[in-house]
Amino acid sequence: MPAFPTMSNRVEVRVKGTAAGIMNREDLVAGLCLFILLVYCTATIFVKAAWPLQSFQMGVFALLAVYLVTGIRKREEGAAKGVAPLLVYFIPVWGLIQILAHTTTSTFQTREAVLRWGALAAVFFLVQIVVRTPAAREIALHAMLFFATVMALLCLTQLFTSKGLVLWIFPSGYPDVYATFPSYNNYAQFIEISLPIAVWYSLRKGLQSWGYILLAGTLYASVIRAASRAGAALCTAELLAILAMRAIGPLKLNRRETKLRMRSITLVLALVPLVAVTFTFVVGWRRIWQRFQQHDDSYLVRSEFLIPTIDMAVHRPLIGYGLGTFPDVYPQYAIKDFPFYLNSAHNDWAEFAADGGIPFLLLVLIPFAAVVPTAIRHPWGLGLVAVMLHACVDFPFPRPAVSGWLFAMLGLLYVARASDRHEDRFKISPGRHDPPTVLEFKH
């Protein structure tokens, strides 16, 4: 069961005079609607038609419109302040500039990209507005974790029984499916976002954290069984990084967790990887081992995608060829013919530079890079760093079933950063605040 923050007399966090643990009805309903939309987007990713993505976008825009009309004056202080988070809202604007300036090679493709980026920016905004308190953040993190676990169980079950049928009903066109994901890489990216949540909570709760340990083992084993090499490497890195951070103790500077005896901590540090490895042996590790052993040319081929992509960025460094136009423009720069349609550069960062120029690359990169220190301070957010790295060899951003959760995590980290700064101001000048009666929290 989720462990909610306990009362303490150390720090008090207030939002317009409201205790930090309280989540009002408007926030709860809006948060639930947003969660349902993200679940819906993930559940329909296997559908090749446009209507699932379009209906997700319409739902997010409708939710944003309703929330702005009914609550903007009351929620205006919720969104993160500063240049970096503000840049997120300029990402879709860049596509509009390309359309208005007639610099895009395909107005249709750029318009679609603007809608997709606009929906992601709306998710980012809504998460910050809705999940403003530590208690709300706990609920959001646990919702993400439990949905990811359901998807992991579905993935493992289908890999052994479905023979390429999504939910045992819908043909995918592939020999295997990974929950509702046709691509094992996209599935791995989805799990990368949630795995650190399970690992970190398992280490925070000591011997009472067996439930989180099982969840972490399930998530990790599902990625190994899915046989995404980059996903397996990054999930392993996430697991080891959080274990090392907890063992070495660099997080003592912001430790606000329940104090555990050293014996309990040591035991949990041993149990988490043990359970992960055990679950991996149960579901099977040979496939991923074979993929690491095989000497295929997949990464060499990706370098042959990357070189023309960089060439595209060099030719139009300021404005790019238009958001979403890479598949149309790439053949003009290709250094080799391939017997398949290339829909992505398999490096999102390079593709951003090709589609939107260097300014667009910075519009996307800066908001994510700025929050990396917060992800290190709050390890439940390390999945954001993992997906950023995975984007160097694949394409998670064009898939809202992945990037929707990624932008939600981005919003949560900016909320955590604002909370940290509020705390620091409290410590520096406690005399200017009311006597504390509060919520102790450490996420």
Regions found by a protein language model. Name each.
Residues 110-113, 294-295:
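Extracellular loop and loop/strand-boundary signature of outer-membrane beta-barrel proteins
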Residues 40-51, 101-102, 168-180, 300, ...:
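Juxtamembrane membrane-water interface segments that cap and precede transmembrane helices
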Residues 4-10, 21, 28-46, 57-68, ...:
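Alpha-helical transmembrane segments of multi-pass inner-membrane proteins
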Residues 80-89, 141-145:
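Cytoplasmic-side transmembrane-helix entry/capping segments in multi-pass membrane proteins
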Residues 1-23, 310, 420-443:
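Short, intrinsically disordered terminal tails adjacent to the first/last structured region
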Residues 42-55, 72-78:
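Short, hydrophobic transmembrane alpha-helix segments
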